[in-house]
């Protein structure tokens, strides 16, 4: 593995726990950035040659390096991918009864630029890092080692991919994935538009916020602005809100709001309105 050498004192943030390396922290006289292909894994050294870890590099980015290990010579491979997927899975399974959650959330799970959202038997995978893209065959193999025979959609259409020099595409990698995938969140049933919706089709990162709204909603009138497919409003209605209005600029999203309300028996409480919230 090649070495990425930092300038004097540029190792401080990494030693304090930070995971990113900025291009202006690299000693380009000793390790010229243009010599590294995007997505290559490198050993990170301080100005005195002491190892700081292993990183994925992209020389064209301001954040040119993302740590994947605090040890040198520990690149992501099949074994390490499977281990990190397993650790991430165990942490989610302890928290959620249903198999509906964000399985992998990038740097926080030691897999920078990777998001995997699980909808029971369906996985939606988003990659925004050139190094993870190069590892895609191994990633799919690792997923099958940890939880075999799931249906997998690669929804790689995010804007960050262009910054990494990656093409956009959406395709099935394994099994069959319908346009709308069922999920359960906070005891409420939904359909996620995983092919054409925003991000992975669902915003699992707001799960706890929506649970909080549920506790406040009983007997209230609720306005859900930028409602998307009704994740907030429908949960409020199920929790006992008197009336809910969902506002969004997308007629397609609002059609799904109506479906979500019907799915949970709260169509009489939830109304959708197309419009510009601003």
Model-derived regions: residue spans:
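Catalytic cores of large soluble enzymes that bind and process phosphate-bearing ligands
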Residues: 73, 77, 131, 135, ...
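Carbohydrate-binding surface patches
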Residues: 122-127
């Amino acid at each position: 593995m090649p070495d990425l050498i930092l300038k004097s004192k540029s190792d401080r943030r990494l030693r304090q726990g930070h995971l990113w390396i900025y291009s202006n922290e690299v000693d380009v006289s000793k390790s010229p950035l243009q010599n590294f292909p995007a997505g290559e894994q490198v050993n990170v050294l301080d100005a005195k040659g002491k190892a700081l870890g292993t990183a994925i590099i992209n020389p064209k980015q301001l954040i040119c390096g993302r740590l994947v290990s605090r040890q040198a010579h520990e690149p992501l491979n099949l074994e390490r991918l499977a281990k990190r997927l397993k650790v991430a899975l165990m942490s989610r399974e302890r928290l959620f009864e249903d198999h509906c959650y964000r399985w992998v959330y990038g740097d926080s799970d030691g897999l920078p630029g990777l998001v995997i959202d699980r909808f029971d038997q369906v996985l939606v995978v988003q990659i925004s890092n050139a190094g993870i893209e190069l590892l895609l065959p191994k990633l799919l193999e690792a997923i099958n080692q940890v939880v075999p025979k799931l249906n997998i959609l690669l929804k790689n259409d995010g804007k960050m991919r262009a910054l990494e020099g990656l093409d956009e595409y959406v395709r099935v990698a394994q099994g069959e994935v319908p346009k709308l995938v069922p999920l359960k969140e906070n005891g409420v049933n939904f359909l996620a538009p995983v092919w054409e919706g925003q991000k992975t089709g669902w915003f699992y990162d707001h799960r706890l916020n929506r649970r909080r709204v549920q506790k406040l909603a009983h007997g209230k009138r609720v306005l859900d602005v930028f409602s998307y497919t009704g994740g907030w409003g429908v949960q409020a209605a199920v929790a006992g809100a008197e009336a809910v209005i969902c506002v969004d600029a997308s007629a397609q999203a609002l059609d799904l709001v109506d479906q979500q309300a019907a799915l949970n028996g709260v169509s009489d409480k939830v109304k959708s309105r197309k419009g510009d919230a601003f």
